[in-house]
From Swiss-Prot:
Disruption phenotype: Leads to the accumulation of the prenylated benzyl alcohols produced by fogH. Its cofactor is FAD. The PKS fogA releases the carboxylic acid (8E,10E,12E)-3,5,7-trihydroxytetradeca-8,10,12-trienoic acid as its product, as well as derivatives with one and two double bonds. Keywords: FAD, Flavoprotein, Oxidoreductase, Signal. This is FAD-linked oxidoreductase fogF. InterPro entries: BBE, FAD-bd_PCMH, FAD-bd_PCMH-like_sf, FAD-bd_PCMH_sub2, FAD-linked_Oxidoreductase, Oxid_FAD_bind_N.
Length: 497
């Protein structure tokens, strides 16, 4: 607790100090030779909006100015400038984060979206992407070159940003986490130094970046290994969308529990607990994928089909078209920015039907008693971990390779933040999060850091066994905590030396 308080006090001091700095004059100083395409913007301009708009507007940071660097050299310049003048800043790619960042007020936004290059090397079976590249920008190029890569569930987040926290997704069972595909990266540290990191170069920092990377610098580019389509069913995927009504959810959850550790590595599911505005009741919108022959996929999904869901739509698509197809194309909806979302999240290493049903029932009661929460929903991701756990636990900083399920309870109130319905949703979120722990398979609440709300302990996000090494890295590469707004690490921890 004392470590968290000290970090908060340091961040508060930086925010207060920023108010006394004339950021506009600082950024527009004539002696600074920014690249011609670098954009500097301030409030009430379209450029500023483009550089700062966030997927989640709840408890969001605020900025006095923004810079959109055109290249790595300008990233170095702005980091040095901000550190020299004690200006708090946050570097972002797709700005699709879950974590509350209300502590950062009137800071500097470093928008990396212009550094969005990508290059596929077919001979080496790699792709190199820039800091602001999103999966949606380069997935087709990878496919057309004859490859595929593990990714998250939507196309709009910055690909590198997802990687820095671990990178779970539908392909975790066959390819592992995104960090398991990472070969090397270039990172700008707090001193403005550019380092190449890999298993053979700055290897200890490379270890820490794979699971807590946003604590050590700004990654300007990264190279990943690709997987041949020819080795993976030519990249063809069976995708199946189902609508499961309230009276059949327990049967569906029983099937999920029966999978347990037997779920095949080439299958994955996302189940959305949502309100049916026509039937005026809860339902589950589920998408399941099977990376393999269509007949095998249909056999795997036969227990769901036997439930006779109210909707069942199956199609066979190339992997690069999955996100735009799955869930009736809900990927685009999940990328809509600006909504005030309060999120409560959790993870598990086993599926329990009773917990899933109790969660569904509690949210149903919430919909019934608070009509303003009709757009409130819960996503439950079921991703097998075969390839993830095949990597030794101590190979990377990521601590939760044994997890196979993730909850994301998303509170959106039509009546606005602070309304009775919003507050009821927040209370329900606390209750639900506590209830998930009991059957999660973990002794305490744990969370994939990219899904962290921000109120979790260090141990719940990073794992107690990883923290000594992580704290030592933080002390070495960012002792002043300039990269301290996104689930910050301490510079001291028992055993860190």
């Amino acid at each position: 607790m004392r470590r968290n308080i000290l970090t908060a006090l340091a961040c508060s001091w930086l925010t207060a100090h920023a108010a006394s700095v004339d950021l506009k004059s600082l950024l527009l100083e004539s002696d600074i030779q920014w690249a011609s395409d670098t954009v500097i913007s301030f409030s009430d301009t379209p450029e500023f909006e483009d550089a700062t708009v966030r997927w989640n507007s709840y408890n969001a940071p605020t900025y006095a100015g923004a810079i959109s660097p055109a290249d790595e050299e300008d990233v170095v310049k702005v980091v040095k400038l901000a550190k020299e003048h004690n200006v708090p800043f946050l570097a972002t790619g797709g700005r699709h984060g879950c974590t509350d960042m209300v502590g950062l007020q009137e800071g500097l936004a470093i928008d990396l979206s212009q550094i969005n290059s990508y290059e596929v090397d077919s001979d080496d079976a790699t792709v190199t992407v820039g800091a602001g590249s999103t999966f949606g920008q380069f997935q087709n190029a990878i496919h057309d070159a004859g490859f595929m890569i593990q990714s998250g569930s939507v196309t709009c987040p910055g690909f590198i940003g997802i990687t820095l926290g671990g990178g779970i997704g539908r392909y975790t069972g066959i390819f592992g986490l995104e960090i398991d595909a990472l070969i090397s990266a270039r990172i700008v540290t707090a001193d403005g130094e550019v380092l190449t990191i890999s298993e053979t170069e700055n290897a200890e920092l490379f270890w820490g970046v794979r699971g807590a990377g946003f604590n050590f610098g700004i990654v300007t580019s990264a190279t990943y290994k690709l997987h041949k389509l020819a080795d993976n069913n030519n990249g063809e995927i069976l995708t199946a969308d189902f609508i499961i009504p309230a009276n059949k959810t327990l049967f569906y959850f029983d099937w999920l529990e029966s999978l347990g550790e037997t779920m095949p590595p080439n299958a994955a599911g996302v189940s959305r607990f949502q309100f049916d505005s026509i039937a005026k009741e809860g339902q589950i919108g589920a998408n399941w994928v099977f990376i393999g022959p269509e007949d095998e996929g249909r056999e795997f999904l036969s227990p769901i089909l036997d439930l006779q869901p109210s909707v069942a739509m199956l199609s066979y698509v190339p992997w690069n078209k999955l996100i735009e197809t799955a869930g009736g194309g809900q990927g685009a909806m999940l990328c809509e920015a600006r909504a005030p979302r309060s999120l409560f999240t959790g993870q598990m290493r086993k599926y329990t039907a009773l917990t899933l049903q109790e969660t569904f029932d509690k949210i149903t009661t919430l919909w019934e008693t608070h009509p303003g929460l009709a757009y409130t929903s819960l996503n439950f991701e079921a991703f097998p971990n075969h390839a993830a756990v095949a990597v030794p636990d101590d190979a990377t900083a990521y601590p939760w390779r044994d997890a196979i399920g993730w909850f994301q309870f998303e509170i959106i109130s039509l009546e606005g933040v602070g309304s009775d319905s919003f507050n009821a949703g927040e209370h329900a979120g606390q209750v639900l999060r506590d209830s998930w722990v009991r059957t999660s398979g973990y002794d305490n609440h744990t969370i994939y850091v990219n899904y962290a709300r921000g109120d979790e302990t260090l141990e719940q996000k990073y794992g107690a066994s990883k923290l000594p090494r992580l704290a030592a890295l933080k002390k070495k590469y960012d002792p002043d905590n300039v990269f301290g707004w996104n689930n910050a690490l301490p510079t001291e921890y028992p055993g860190s030396g």
